[in-house]
């Protein structure tokens, strides 16, 4: 396998504890809980042992609460996978695993105002009210809606999501939810927040937070790469060139959210931060282009591990 084939763009642990990975070379692999390869997802919706490429550039994967798999691509829209069959049991005392899906493809249609606002999808998220939000890199925020007869529509700034600040929120990288039903949208031009407790889409109020020069408690940078809430319900905003921004305000429905910033001056390996995840010991790992940084949120200290050293150790 080449480095190009191995580079992972998106991954998902599904409700059967299988791992889905989408590579830069357009392969989607599914692994069993024991780490063995179940197979590759084909364009026909089969999981097969034969190495087959899926469609172009999958950048995001979501399993919704009904068990459907959603795949967002860089330039050809959104795919919905619905299970239609099961395979023989995998491993000892394992439930039967799904091995075939029907595929539904959604794209931007210039003549349909309720189609996707853009075919470039970087993030898909289902919130606590079961709303599925789709973040487009070039089309802003979309709310996916489905009728009982199966018709799918997308609500965005070109139809009913009229208050969405498309001038600032055109390019969405990440969507998540903080405690209290606050949806956070990371864009290339700041952080957007709103409440998912709404009755009419036209009435949603959006709040925008950006870097304010001279204000040490504003965002360090506006290009938001990732947003993460840890087990202690503390939310962190990861910004490219701005490191880690910890939310210290109790109210996120505000245009004056206060942050505590951590960057190279505080021990972070690089300000070019990309994402964050928490481990079983409640340590937070920050991924950058050159290193992994382990952050102790109690002591507020970093331990850094250069990626080149990690790769060398794996090769020994």
Identify what each model region corresponds to.
Residues 1-316:
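Carboxylate-rich, polar loop motifs that coordinate divalent cations or form catalytic acidic clusters
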